[in-house]
Amino acid sequence: LVAQFFLKKAMMNQTNPPQRPKRAQRSDGRSTRAVVLEAAGKVFAERGFAEATSKEICERAGTNGAAVNYYFGGKEGLYEEVLIEAHRQMLSLEDLNRIITSEATPEEKLRVFLKHIIRTAMNASELWGIRIFLRELASPSPFVPKFITTAVFPKSQKLRELIRDITGLPPDSPAMQRATALVALPCMGLILFPEKLRTLMLPATAGDAEGLLEDMLAYMLGGLRALGETAR
């Protein structure tokens, strides 16, 4: 009888296993993962990957010291996510896709795209992602190739759709690659070029957003159309 009692109790435990307590939510409504990612971006921007520590990141985030390993698998995995978020701060894939798939003309889509880029450039000093990329330009990390595949290529493909509609260039042609570079690189340069230096050297690029937009639009449309004519 005693054996039957313990056997029955064991079977009940198997069919009704104890429930894990639910993880408490943060009072501010933000997920712990997002808070750690934000704190990490700021720490990496200040110190670089080599000097940053998981301990400091967790302290900044106000989380358990094991949060980096729990959510990202370690500092390396966290930095990979930080690079993706840094690129998203400049232009998210969702925003770009919304522009490309709109009912607007290709010329108007390019205008909206450039307006977004200029707005980002005007607020670049507030974005830790910009400092991350300045560090990467000075000393590229081994995480860049994966970041390019994960974050840059999907946006590049979307941008090519817009360029194709303006130029008529084949999507995989060398001319399309060059055209994409001639659109993307000036945008990146505008965002990454420190605002204080732009104000000193080229003040018209720092204060007159509307004038800059019209000039960039005319410059890029003229160039892209010329490339399309040359390829025909």
Can you say where each PLM-predicted feature lies in the sequence?
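Helix-turn-helix
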Residues: 35, 43-77, 81
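N-terminal intrinsically disordered/low-complexity leader segments
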Residues: 1-31, 42, 230-232
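Short alpha-helical scaffolding segments that buttress acidic/His motifs in well-ordered protein cores
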Residues: 117, 130-137, 180-187, 216, ...
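Short secondary-structure transition hinges
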Residues: 90-97, 101, 118-157, 204-210
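Generic hydrophobic, amphipathic alpha-helix propensity
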Residues: 32-41, 57, 82-90, 159
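Hydrophobic/aromatic-rich alpha-helical bundle segments in the mid-to-C-terminal region
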Residues: 145-153, 162-217, 227-232
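Hydrophobic alpha-helical connector segments
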Residues: 95-127, 173-183
